[in-house]
Amino acid sequence: MVIAINCRHLTPNKLEGFGTYTYELVTRWIKEHNEVNFVLIFDREPTVVIPELPNVKKVIIGPPTRHPLLYWIWFEWSIPRILKRYKATLFFSPDGYNSLRSRVPSVITVHDLNFEHNPADLPKVLGWYLRKFVPKFVEKATRVLTVSAYSKQDITKCYRCASEKISTVYNGANEIYQPLSEDVKITTRKRISNNRPYFLFVGSLHPRKNVQRLITAYQGINNPSVDLVIVGSAMWRDHQISVDPNGADRIHFLGYLAQKELAEVMGSALALTYVPYFEGFGIPLVEAMRCGIPILAANTTCLPEIAGNAAIYCDPFNVQEIQTGLEQLIENDTLRIQLSENSINRATEFSWDQAAKQSWEVIYTTANT
């Protein structure tokens, strides 16, 4: 059996979203299934460490996918050549893209359909490409994976895809996320917020992550005793976030952080404040739960499904509701303690080991059908 995998998101300092998902599944599969040959396909020289194993072949083929036209060339010309050359049994694409020209059976993961519901969130050409081709990718796929019951329902409804074709497999979180000692928390706070407690947002600064409303809500709090820390990189150059100069020194933009440092920043936070208006899963929720910290989450899409009783909720479009949620977490010690306990308990429902096992069952069954 030969399983070919789209690994184009395994790029340095970019292991978030698709990259994290790809890495966590692929590294487990290649270690646990030495009876299977894996062809890992990159669009440029990989720098992410993938174990060197006899059953793994790394293939680099251009063009680097930096524009929808290049996406089309890579998936419709480069990928079919590689699948044919290595006699692939199945093609797995963890980012929802597919090759329409290939005759090889495929499994794709569609994480969410934000581009269908909020087209203004994306550059026009990219949004057009996704709306035109993702329905075709889903139709072409032999099986579809997705990461929440909400996303499964959305794909079924938007694309009239049979629910039996779609399997829901929850994501996990890196085991490096753990409750921290008070000494580590103090050291971390001294480093990033002058030892003041802080709210934390983690994620790409994409419009749907709703960081602007979060900042506006935070700056509406009168003389807050808690800072706000933003971790993540901008997705689009034209997406600007504005901060009122009054109190701007209490908001800290840290950019992208590697896992080890992020785990310390996460575990030292007073709470995770995660209020996107559209989400397919939300890995930071599970990272926060593993650390045992409270969560303020949006009450939309998949977020209540994932966060459960580890969070309090707000309308992501209502700045006053977001502000009220922040104020509750500042003022109500009993609430924070209860949410922390709930976080620890709920975190046990999510793991990359389980995600890899359940996803592999779909891959293996499809390849042998």
Language-model features, listed with the residues they occupy:
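Carbohydrate transferase catalytic cores enriched for Leloir-type hexosyltransferases
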Residues: 1-369
